Amino acid sequence: CMALSFGACQDIVTYNDNYDDEMASSGAPVIDAVYDSKDRDKLLPITDGNLEQMIVLDGSNLSRVRKVMFNDVELPVGEVYATASSAYLPIPRQIPLEVNNKLYYETELGSTTYDFTVSVPLVQVDGLYNEFALPGTSVQLKGKYFDLYGFGGANSTSTVKMNGVELEVDSISDKYMSV
């Protein structure tokens, strides 16, 4: 003799408990303050920053970013981590052509600007490598920010001269330039 018994229960429970994933925005973005990312307690708001500095925007409706600009330099949206109340982003490593000292922030629901100054560093020359080079050989200028100012390459906008003669730039990085 064989007996079969089937039973079923529905044990699906939905819990909401007012959960907020911090991604919902309800209007145009508002920036209340900007902080250095190292200031985890958000104690000292900043009004200026340096190239490549990580900053945190504090405000509301900051999720769903479409565009961020410092002066006229656009930051790729993929570099922004944003929730409704904060956005973490780097200041782009590029010198602006037009300086208006504004941070422009655009989302799906609107845009805003915030007064923010980006400090642009000057070219810094610290010294030479191979300072006793023979005529016709290359030397390296050591320093910082050579790549920001248009030295070398097909689209160069800056030149290096020695005794009035323009030198050809062989290679360049942010910390050295070979001429």
Please provide the spans of the model-predicted regions.
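Short, aromatic- and glycine-rich surface loops/edge beta-strands on solvent-exposed regions
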Residues: 97-109
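Short, surface-exposed loop motifs enriched in S/T, G, D/E and P with embedded aromatic residues
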Residues: 74-80, 116, 166-171
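Aromatic sugar-binding surface patches on proteins
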Residues: 80-90, 171-178
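Hydrophobic beta-strand core residues of beta-sandwich domains
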Residues: 47-49, 68, 81, 95, ...
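C-terminal motif of bacterial Sec signal peptides marking the signal peptidase cleavage site
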Residues: 4-8
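Short, surface-exposed loop/turn segments at beta-strand-coil junctions that are enriched for proline
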Residues: 91-97
